[in-house]
Amino acid sequence: MGYARLKGLLRRDVATVLGGGRSYSHGTAFGALPRRVKLVEVGPRDGLQNEKVIVPTDVKVDLINRLADAGLPVIEATSFVSPKWIPQMADQVEVMRSIKKLPNVSYPVLTPNLQGFKAAMNAGAKEVAIFGAASESFSRKNINCSIAESIERFQEVMDAARVAGIPVRGYVSCVVGCPYQGNVSPAKVAEVAKRMHDMGCYEVSLGDTIGVGTPGSIRAMLVAVLHELPAGVLAMHCHNTYGQALANILTALQMGVSVVDSSVAGLGGCPYAGAASGNVATEDVLYMLHGLGIDTGVDLQKVIEAGNFICRVLGRPNGSSVATATSKL
């Protein structure tokens, strides 16, 4: 087959997946898969929080609006933390008041304590998130308290949110490995996830913060968590440090999880885990899901364009393999 013909076939197949076409059916080779997956876009918050150069507010707003226009149903917009700790998020109020806020899109914000929750409410936030850990060492270095103490702090936020009618999402970091203590017990992950859910978190996102997970360790962790909580209240949040993120997500899908966190252009990392590379790229997750025939309601091409936009502003290559590959076709 000639190169020109091969390239033409590649363009056709890629165009099918970019458009959300079902190139492949739900085959038994992959096991049971959800027919629809909800993507939670974390790029504007988790993706940008580590950038040393402050990203202009209008750029953040433009990025969020582009992602919303692409059909992403949940976009984590910003974080109501002290600018002393995360300077990049100092413009949280301006961001929340400037984005378009489409009626079919949720714009949750991170609120680590009651002060942050109150500030978020004053800025018009309609959903918030809290952030905990399954690693005692990570919890102490990240939020300067034990896991038990962090849960107590979150209770204030949960109580205030309940009174205000605000839904709360929970994050559990270091679900398979910790940069300080190594392996993390699946039983501990299950314990923390259940406590968050019992407190009132409608959804608990399980984060492989430093990206050391494999399908084997992710499966073992999920087996433990699924003994305590149904798959319908769980989400998977993977980093791609060792190139395992998509395989890990597929494993979670096969086990019944149907919510996936991802970051446009693979932006982000963790300010407390220096070796961790970016979150799994939204574009790459979409390409895999669409190729499996799973509905997302998201326009992949528009997400690619949003990723290229923010990467031009940041002056860095796009971290999405799909975005990079399609730019060469």
Identify the meaning behind each predicted range:
Residues 2-329:
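Catalytic cores and adjacent flexible loops of soluble metabolic enzymes
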